[in-house]
Amino acid sequence: MQDNPDLSILSQPDKSSGKLFVILCASGFENIPRVRSALMFATLAASAEYRTILYCVQEAVDVMVRGAIEEKEKPQPNVPTLRQRLDEAMEMGVEIQCCTQTMANNNITEQDLLPGVKPAGAMGLITLTSQAAGSLCF
């Protein structure tokens, strides 16, 4: 297994309240509404002053690859796009992390990821969820 825990993310300053909320997303382009929901709930948690981390694993990692949203999503009338939801989340300070093992399995490098999206090992997710005030999975 490639995961070497990078616990440096734990030393980053929390939001003023010190509360942590983790959202795990395993859905990708096969279920875009679930990804939109994960991004929406991440934005809501961040707006409630939680330090919010969206951890992407499996199919969700594909969504965080440069150019993938524009290539694969077909926008629908009166429905927010993934890009809109992603931009909202990032503007609110949501931290987005991608599973390094999923990245390795799919030959995705850190340079392939969208700006601001960081690779992170599975042990980091375990540590974060053990400290979180709450978590959701999509």
Per-region residue spans from a language model:
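Histidine-anchored nucleotide/phosphate-binding helix
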Residues: 35-50, 54
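Aromatic- and Gly/Pro-rich donor/ligand-binding loops
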Residues: 137-138
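A glycine-rich helix N-cap at a beta->alpha junction
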Residues: 71-102
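A short aromatic-anchored loop/beta-hairpin motif
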Residues: 88-89, 97, 106, 110, ...
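Short internal beta-strands
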Residues: 52-57, 96-100
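Short, glycine-rich nucleotide/cofactor-binding loops
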Residues: 16-17, 23-36
